[in-house]
Structures are given as structure tokens and as C-alpha cells.
């Protein structure tokens, strides 16, 4: 996704978003210190910038007021507003993000129908030396989740962070982060608890570390994570380590994933700074 501009007045931001929707361009608003306007389809960036310049010159033009009225009264060109949650899901998620989400859901359904152990026998980290050449096992543990809260929590973060990485940096970058963090976080976790674990959280922590540090060191990348959220991630690791909530957490995977993400972001930002 590409951030187009920011407005201090959220109503002005909404007026521009409404008008562009009538032109067939879908923009989204994210509220931070100001109302940030984001574009999912970057091929339309130049067109949006031209329209933005016109809008800034005369935001009170009747066509903008008409577009705002239309967004509240009709469906023409603005049906996305009836289902903003679904529209946001589509706009923020690329193919890799969706494939992983669907795989997690399908595996969760299978575990609910035929039992956790049956699925784990096929997807868990190698639990016997004879299985060490079944290469998929070093990665497929990320698809297994053991409760509804477990999968919802992980998929929400995966969509939010993985989608941003894929939209801004490409599917290849998301694949690399996912594969490397799945392998290394899984390796560390099996040293902590043995092979019977699962979940996307090691990868999620890698994405947290990557997005946060990449945003801090390379703001032009267009990805960022609020510092409050990275603090939350660290507190969650501490809570899991000391078992404050009485829940079984993959602490080794969380710590390893976070370190992997930070390291990858550091390397990538070094390369970016060398190019500039």
C-alpha cells in the first residue's frame, strides 16, 4: 500500500476518499495523529495525485460535496462502504497473505474434525530421526492452532503485518521472512519444549520486529509499527516467560522470531542506506 497524504481534518479526508470512489479508485483512511490516506493499487498513484492537487485547490467544489452525499445515499461506485471490513481485508492482503491464512483455517478445521494428534503426526516438527528428511515439517508447524482464540489472534496480526509487508515490499520479501522465521523459531522452540508445538506466532513476532525496525530505520519503505505495539509484544513475551496468565505459550518461538525479524530488518536497512 502507498500512503498518499494526511489531513488534520478527518471530514476533509473522507470527502476526498468519497470522491475518488466515484472515480473507481478505492482509498482507505487510517487514523493516527492525522487521517492518513492509503492507496492499495499503486498503479493508480499518479492519477490520485493529480486529483489530490485539484482537491486541495478547491475542497469545497460541488462535485466533492456531491460525492460525499452519494456515498451516504447510493450504492453507485461505493458498494465497498457497505462492507468496509471485507473491503479492508482485500485491500491489505496480497496472495501470500491469503494463502497462509486459508491454509491455517483449513488445518484448524481438520484438527477440529479428526483430532489434533492426527494432524500433528503429519505436520509437526520431526519427532523421530527417521522423519528428518521430510522437509515440509520444518515449516508446516506454523499452520497448526489449538484454539479459536489462538488462530484468531495470530491471523489478525499476520494479516495486519504480513499484508503490509507484501503490499509495500512484495510477495518475495514476505515469503523470505516467513520461511526463515518459521525454520529458526521452530528449531528454537523444539529445543525448549520438544516437537509438539504449533502456531504462526513465531512468524508473527518476526514480522513485528521487522516492520518496527524497518519503519524506524527506513521510513521511506512505507511500513511501520507503532512503538506502543512493539512494547506490547515485549510485554507479552515477558508474560509468557513467567506464565502470568497460566497459558501454554511458545516462548522460544516468540523470542527467536522477534530476533530474526529485527536482524533481517537491520540487514535490509543497511543495504537501503548503502544504495542511497
Swiss-Prot record:
The keyword Cell inner membrane applies. Gene3D superfamilies: 3.30.70.2350, Rhomboid-like. GO terms for biological process: proteolysis. The active site is at 201 (nucleophile), 254. Belongs to the peptidase S54 family. PANTHER family: RHOMBOID PROTEASE GLPG, RHOMBOID-RELATED PROTEIN. This is Rhomboid protease GlpG.
Amino acid at each position: 500500500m502507498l500512503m498518499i497524504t494526511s489531513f488534520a481534518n478527518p471530514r476533509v479526508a473522507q470527502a476526498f476518499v468519497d470522491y475518488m470512489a466515484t472515480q473507481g479508485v478505492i482509498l482507505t483512511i487510517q487514523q493516527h495523529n492525522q487521517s492518513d490516506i492509503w492507496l492499495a493499487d499503486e498503479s493508480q498513484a499518479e492519477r490520485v495525485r493529480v486529483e489530490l492537487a485539484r482537491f486541495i485547490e478547491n475542497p469545497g467544489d460541488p462535485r466533492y460535496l456531491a460525492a460525499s452525499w452519494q456515498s451516504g445515499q447510493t450504492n453507485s461506485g461505493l458498494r465497498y462502504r457497505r462492507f468496509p471490513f471485507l473491503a479492508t481485508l482485500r485491500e491489505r492482503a496480497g496472495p501470500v497473505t491469503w494463502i497462509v491464512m486459508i491454509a491455517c483455517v483449513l488445518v484448524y478445521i481438520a484438527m477440529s474434525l479428526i483430532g489434533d494428534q492426527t494432524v500433528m503426526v503429519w505436520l509437526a516438527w520431526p519427532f523421530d530421526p527417521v522423519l528428518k528428511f521430510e522437509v515440509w515439517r520444518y515449516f508446516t508447524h506454523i499452520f497448526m492452532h489449538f484454539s479459536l482464540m489462538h488462530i484468531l489472534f495470530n491471523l489478525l496480526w499476520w494479516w495486519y503485518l504480513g499484508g503490509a509487508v507484501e503490499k509495500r515490499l512484495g510477495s518475495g520479501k514476505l515469503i523470505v521472512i516467513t520461511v526463515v522465521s518459521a525454520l529458526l523459531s521452530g528449531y528454537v522452540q523444539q529445543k525448549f519444549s520438544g516437537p509438539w508445538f504449533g502456531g504462526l506466532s513465531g512468524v508473527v513476532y518476526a514480522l513485528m520486529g521487522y516492520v518496527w525496525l524497518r519503519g524506524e530505520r527506513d521510513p521511506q519503505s512505507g511500513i511501520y509499527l507503532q512503538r506502543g505495539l512493539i512494547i506490547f509484544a515485549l510485554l507479552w513475551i515477558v508474560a509468557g516467560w513467567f506464565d502470568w496468565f497460566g497459558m501454554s505459550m511458545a516462548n522460544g518461538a516468540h523470542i527467536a522470531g522477534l530476533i530474526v525479524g529485527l536482524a533481517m530488518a537491520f540487514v535490509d536497512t543497511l543495504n537501503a542506506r548503502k544504495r542511497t
